[in-house]
Amino acid sequence: MDVHGAAYATHGKGVTGIAALDIQQGVSLRDYSTMRLGGWAAYLAHVRSPAEVEEGIAWAEARHLPVIMVGGGSNIIWRDEGFAGLVLVNRIPGFELADQGGHLLLTVGAGENWDSVVARAVAAGASGIERLSLIPGTAGATPVQNVGAYGQEIADVLVSVDAYDRQERRFVRIPAAECAFGYRRSRFNQADRGRFFITALTLRLLREPPRAPFYPALGRYLEERGLTHPTVQQVRDAVIAIRRAKLPDPAHVANCGSFFRNPIIPAPQAAELLRRYPDMPHWPVPGGGVKLAAGWLIDRAGFRGVADPETGMGTWPAQALVVVNHRASSTADLLRFKQKVQDEVRRRFGVTLEQEPELLP
């Protein structure tokens, strides 16, 4: 770490090396995660084109430094040790909607704000991502964890991902069929974690009204308002209203959204739990497993709306699945609180909860 001592001591000072990039030295990473925790980056630069991504990588490699790329920071948590290399912050713009006759092709820059992408697509009459409204972060993050909500996920509409392949040292286009999508998983956060720096993605959307069946909470909301044949804009508005009612705004309350994945357990284990807890929410999934609601498990374990005095962390009163940073001073505090929740859920239900936000580096 001694080689980066000057970087950590000179916070915010620009360094030279690439004319096109403004590479900052010694930058707090708390501003690059909506949980607002973590250490310092030795170097950080905002990239606004694929060429700048390639330049940033070359700059770091020439100095034998590790390099990582992030988006809006809504699904990442930085370690207290920070990052002793170059952090590239994806700000690549772009929005192009092309009519293909029976469908629409939407190509967006990976640095675009995701909800702004959804809003523009919906305003153009396109359907397919309206239920993914108000999800924080950038477009480039959506295929990484196969973002999903209210019965839609990015894998349903993705055509391809454009990215810089650090292994092959060239730009590539990856078809959706080669992304290895699963529940909140893809090759980008599993087998090929860190290999691809996503620069753009192309989606296949429709000019059709949204189709039922709707996710239960969304369906009830629409039915209560007499919207039996809702427009795509009405579905977006409904999703926004539901999310705002139960989820904190990361701009005002430090959080990363859903902190734990909904666990999938074997059917016999689910049957035993249902015998003990008949009201437990559950859904069958392909392969014979059963998905449980992590928020319900956390709630029943006694962690809904808590404010832990030891760690400064807590959970959101309207949705126990959301871990919030009240006054934590370190990522270590967050990880201690996470362990408390996991231990109690495991003790009561025999179910292990997995963390959803990625711990970096």
Curated annotation (Swiss-Prot):
Pfam families: FAD_binding_4 (PF01565), MurB_C (PF02873). It catalyses: UDP-N-acetyl-alpha-D-muramate + NADP(+) = UDP-N-acetyl-3-O-(1-carboxyvinyl)-alpha-D-glucosamine + NADPH + H(+). The lineage of its organism: Bacteria, Bacillati, Bacillota, Clostridia, Eubacteriales. Keywords: Cell cycle, Cell division, Cell shape, Cell wall biogenesis/degradation, Cytoplasm, FAD, Flavoprotein, NADP, Oxidoreductase, Peptidoglycan synthesis. Its EC number is 1.3.1.98. GO terms for cellular component: cytosol. The keyword DNA damage does not apply. Its main location: cytoplasm. Cell wall formation. It comes from Symbiobacterium thermophilum (strain DSM 24528 / JCM 14929 / IAM 14863 / T). The active site is at residues 184, 258, 356. This is UDP-N-acetylenolpyruvoylglucosamine reductase 1. Belongs to the MurB family. The gene is murB1. Pathway: Cell wall biogenesis; peptidoglycan biosynthesis. Residues 35-208 form the FAD-binding PCMH-type domain. It is an enzyme of class 1 (oxidoreductase). The keyword Lyase does not apply. Transmembrane segments: none annotated. GO terms for biological process: cell division; cell wall organization; peptidoglycan biosynthetic process; regulation of cell shape. Its cofactor is FAD. InterPro entries: FAD-bd_PCMH, FAD-bd_PCMH-like_sf, FAD-bd_PCMH_sub1, FAD-bd_PCMH_sub2, MurB, MurB_C, MurB_C_sf, Oxid_FAD_bind_N. It is found in: Cytoplasm. GO terms for molecular function: FAD binding; UDP-N-acetylmuramate dehydrogenase activity.
